[in-house]
Amino acid sequence: MVYNNLYELTAKELRDKFLSNELSAEEIVNSFYERIEKVEDKIKSFVSLRKDKALDEARKLDEKRKNGEKLGRLAGIPIAIKDNILMEGQKSTSCSKILENYIGIYDATVVKKLKEEDAIIIGITNMDEFAMGSTTKTSFHHKTSNPWDLNRVPGGSSGGAAASVAAQEVPISLGSDTGGSVRQPASFCGVVGFKPTYGRVSRYGLMAFASSLDQIGTLAKTVEDIAICMNVIAGVDDYDATVSKKEVPDYTEFLNKDIKGLKIGLPKEYFIEGLNPEIKNVVDNSVKALKELGAEVVEISLPHTKYAVPTYYVLAPAEASSNLARFDGIRYGYRAKDYTDLESLYVKTRSEGFGAEVKRRIMIGTYVLSAGFYDAYFKKAQKVRTLIKQDFENVLNEVDVILTPVAPSVAFKLSDTKTPIELYLEDIFTISANLAGVPAISLPGGLVDNLPVGVQFMGKPFDEEILIKIADALEKKIGRLNLPKLD
């Protein structure tokens, strides 16, 4: 490829040009801010930018290079982070009115790791409020548009993160994935979205939605860029007891590998009525390409898939209602003005501070945890979650990876008024990976009506390497999508 603009380069290419003295960090960062200035009014990926600070950090990095000091693994790479990942001194709102003026008092572990490796954080991206949604329309700040069609949603909840990469405003964005919030927007926006195994990346500093499901993920233009970022953000953390102590491999060693003999499973339950036939064609084309690369493809069964959506929408709201109890108008965040006593302070603050979707999920969560319904809903959902997990364990003993669609439809219009149930059903193909705690990656597989469509690979827990290997092989076989110019 011939690049006329720096923003078209991948993170790997930018880093190489920085390390070889071909480009300065200041030039790189400036070029991305120029791109943001040009397209941000159309897309609205960001809720805040840190231009002065980022340029200052870039100049310091140039000085570091000039002095011959050791440079980090992400030196010179601009990165964006989702608005629910804390950064010291930076406004972090989770795109909610209740936190509209909250300033982070410490760095999330992933942010700390990025900074230690000389990445430059250029801005904070838009999202659905408290990561609850699949459109980025529930954000308190504004709606984000899909760079492929400005009248369509970018997906959610990490819609701003996906749109920022697709609009080439940044080469890598960090998001969070509780039920598909990295992979679905990656599919809608034609970029790569990676959700690691639960416990592979620290959640310290991630605003909690559903603590047993949340995982920080990465969005980028290429699988290689995902591998480079994962090398930095994965691994043990003293501040998060759920992080595995398993050694983190060098994910870049699994790029450019032969996948001959790999066994891929296609779950029959994922190719159902309601799946756009043209999306099935995209998956079929990927299957054909994988067979040409020497992989073996077999049909498999994940029998409890039909229970995944109801299970998720009992467990996730239950955890959310508990996690969001801390936003009460007393400790921090928004506080209602007209109240008469403590109870009215709580009620008014939470009624005014939370949006409709968040309130809906708090109510669902409170209901399923209440004394009369705990056994009927929450306890039963936990049992079904175990069955879903067992389905994955059984199947992943027979095959190396599972291949599925990411979403049953292409990006829908911003003007579409889908019911909450219709939106919840959009998560059918992504939430099982969170319920089972397995890693998953969404890779652009092709176009349907000039809109991008992703394919999803899921693998064994803590075997991110095989997903990097197979997604990279498929990406190189079918080629990358040409991202929209937005001129």
UniProtKB/Swiss-Prot annotation:
Coiled coil: none annotated. Its EC number is 6.3.5.7. It catalyses: L-glutamyl-tRNA(Gln) + L-glutamine + ATP + H2O = L-glutaminyl-tRNA(Gln) + L-glutamate + ADP + phosphate + H(+). GO terms for molecular function: ATP binding; glutaminyl-tRNA synthase (glutamine-hydrolyzing) activity. It comes from the Bacteria. The keyword Manganese does not apply. Keywords: ATP-binding, Ligase, Nucleotide-binding, Protein biosynthesis. The active site is at 82 (charge relay system), 157 (charge relay system), 181 (acyl-ester intermediate). It is an enzyme of class 6 (ligase). Belongs to the amidase family. GatA subfamily. HAMAP family: GatA (MF_00120). Heterotrimer of A, B and C subunits. Allows the formation of correctly charged Gln-tRNA(Gln) through the transamidation of misacylated Glu-tRNA(Gln) in organisms which lack glutaminyl-tRNA synthetase. The reaction takes place in the presence of glutamine and ATP through an activated gamma-phospho-Glu-tRNA(Gln). This is Glutamyl-tRNA(Gln) amidotransferase subunit A. It comes from Fusobacterium nucleatum subsp. nucleatum (strain ATCC 25586 / DSM 15643 / BCRC 10681 / CIP 101130 / JCM 8532 / KCTC 2640 / LMG 13131 / VPI 4355).
